[in-house]
Regions:
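Short, acidic, metal-binding catalytic loop of nucleotide-sugar glycosyltransferases
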Residues: 3-12
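Conserved donor NDP-sugar-binding/catalytic core segment of glycosyltransferases
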Residues: 77-111, 117-119
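Glycine-rich, basic loop-to-helix element that forms the pyrophosphate-binding segment
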Residues: 41-62
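Short beta-strand/loop segment that forms part of the nucleotide-sugar
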Residues: 12-21, 40-42
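Short, flexible, basic/aromatic active-site loop/helix in glycosyltransferases
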Residues: 117-144
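Short beta-strand-to-loop acidic/aromatic patch adjacent to the donor-nucleotide binding site
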Residues: 63-75
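Active-site-adjacent helix/loop segment of glycosyltransferases
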Residues: 183-256
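A short, conserved alpha-helix in the catalytic core of glycosyltransferases
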Residues: 144-195
């Protein structure tokens, strides 16, 4: 990830790495290989939401107009930054932009080309996942949510909205952020001109993790409780056996990291 970031064409940017109290030698490796990159070391693992919030709080407001949140298991195209920033220049209602994301091991196979959220059925999914790239995924468009793997926001917008909700310790915090943005009348845009690759596998029969799937389900139901209206929530409760079944059937196609 850091090697690809060093090659981006955008000139005015700073890389900041947040270490969520890792127990391996990540900190030592980064300090040795990238001594000029600021490293935010957290005193414990705050999860995705808490870790990113604390990394954001380390930024200086007068030096940060835009912020890109990026997972460490990614590789970026050298031109990925400006397409994410450009929409903000002409539309103040755009609060979040998100790139097209491919599987790294299969660089033409899509991992994310927009997000679907249905608060009646409880379905949350990626558009285009495991589909080969084609013209229909090359159009800028409003989308329901931006994946936390990579997205861009104005510094002030992220601060105004309060960052990630840390009641989501793992999973669905990215969906929650986008739904909060949209509830306020603002927009989330999918930007296919910006491209990154995610180091996950699209193979059938990925690693089975019961605890991981249970955490995903917990995150989903926290999401529904927060954002669904009473009728939608009743619908989701009635459909919950099918939602749970869908999550476990989806393990056949789960992402193996």
């Amino acid at each position: 990830c850091l090697e690809s970031l060093k090659k981006v064409s955008y000139s005015n940017y700073t890389i900041i790495v947040a270490d969520n109290n890792s127990s391996d030698n990540s900190v030592e490796t980064i300090n040795a290989d990238y001594p000029n990159i600021p490293l935010v070391r957290l005193d414990k693992n705050y999860g995705y939401a808490g870790g990113n919030n604390r990394a954001f709080n380390s930024l200086k407001e007068d030096e940060s107009e835009y912020v890109i949140f990026l997972n460490n298991d990614t590789v970026v195209d050298e031109n990925f930054i400006f397409p994410l920033i450009e929409p903000f220049l002409t539309n103040k209602n755009i609060y979040q932009t998100v790139p097209k994301i491919f599987y790294q091991k299969n660089p033409k196979l899509i991992w994310y080309a927009g997000g679907n959220v249905n608060l009646w059925t409880g379905k949350v999914s990626h558009k285009g996942i495991r589909q080969y790239d084609n013209e229909k995924y090359n159009l800028k468009s409003l989308t329901k949510y931006a994946t936390g793997c990579c997205f861009c926001m104005r510094y002030n917008d992220f601060k105004e909205i309060g960052g990630f909700d840390e009641n989501f310790p793992m999973y669905s915090e990215d969906v929650d952020l986008s739904l909060t943005i949209r509830k306020q009348g603002n927009e989330v845009w999918y930007i296919p001109e910006s491209i990154i690759w995610h180091k996950v596998s699209a193979s059938i029969g990925g690693s089975f993790s019961l605890s991981k799937n249970m955490k995903k389900l917990r995150g989903l139901f926290l999401l529904f409780k927060k954002h669904a209206n009473p009728f939608q929530y009743l619908s989701i409760i009635l459909l919950s056996p099918f939602i749970i079944l869908f999550q476990f059937v989806n393990l056949l196609f789960t992402i193996k990291k």
